Amino acid sequence: MTVLHSVDFFPSGKAPVAIEPRLPQAAFPEHHHDFHEIVIVEHGTGIHVFNGQPYTISGGTVCFVRDHDRHLYEHTDNLCLTNVLWRSPDAFQFLAGLDQLLPQEQDGYYPSHWRVNQSVLQQVRQLVGLMERAGDSMDAPAVANREILFMQLLVLLRRSSLMEGATNNDAKLNQLMAWLEEHFAEEVCWEAVAEQFSLSLRTLHRQLKQHTGLTPQRYLNRLRLIKARHLLRHSDHSVTEIAYRCGFGDSNHFSTLFRREFNWSPRDIRQGRDAIIQ
């Protein structure tokens, strides 16, 4: 597995934070780093496989990667990221207690992926721009200024995350997408889902298409197919059982959609043929 080292990304041996744009981010094999990373998705879509679990990401997704996490990107479509790299909590001169602003693992579950709305994403861009222009001077006021900007970014993300329960349409869509991530295998009635999240059906269609480039049903199908591919690689369930587990009522229809999405049949993935080619 590829290991990325801080010496290749940070401007000096003491700098606690670095900005690394990926415009766009191509598919990238599994790796980990000796530093922490906040991944901010500007726009586009892709699959983020985080510690072996696949997540669909799009504009407004924010992922918190720790120095022992492993991850990769695949199936990317104009996926543009800004990576805010930071060494460790004890690398800062003026900041303490950062863990209170970051997602925390509880009972083996780490809420690594948050979502923010488009207006917050614009504020994030402005803060990141200030961080990029802050320079590399190591005198105390300059260091303090850069650390303050990093703290402001964490506060903004924390306040604006899904967990804060905002009520505008962007926030409602974020909540809906998080719900789909958990309930993808269930039968979905879009009229009922729209009502559940206090959105009109037309607004749901329009906003999901703007965020992901896909209609709601195509987005749901892709989500199901991603989960199915993960099970094909990492479980012993039959293709038919996986199809049903991921919300498909007919295994032949599942196989057709799967090949159309990934250019491989479920059997090819089960036998690891895609990995051999790569």
From Swiss-Prot:
Task performed by this protein = Activates expression of the rhaBAD and rhaT operons.
Per UniProt, residues of the HTH araC/xylS-type domain are: 174-272
Self-association and partners: Binds DNA as a dimer.
Q: Which GO terms describe its cellular component?
A: cytoplasm
Q: Which part of the chain engages DNA, per the record?
A: 191-212, 239-262
What is a single Pfam family found in this protein's UniProt entry? AraC_binding
GO BP, sorted A to Z = positive regulation of DNA-templated transcription; rhamnose metabolic process
Record's signal peptide: none
Superkingdom classification of source = Bacteria
Q: Which UniProt keywords apply?
A: Activator, Cytoplasm, DNA-binding, Repeat, Rhamnose metabolism, Transcription, Transcription regulation
Q: Where in the cell is it found?
A: Cytoplasm
Q: Note the NCBIfam families from the entry.
A: PRK13503.1
Q: Where is this site: Interaction with sigma-70?
A: 241, 250
The protein depicted here goes by the name: HTH-type transcriptional activator RhaS
- Which HAMAP family does the entry mention? HTH_type_RhaS (MF_01534)
Q: Which GO terms describe its molecular function?
A: DNA-binding transcription factor activity; sequence-specific DNA binding
Listed SMART domains = HTH_ARAC (SM00342)
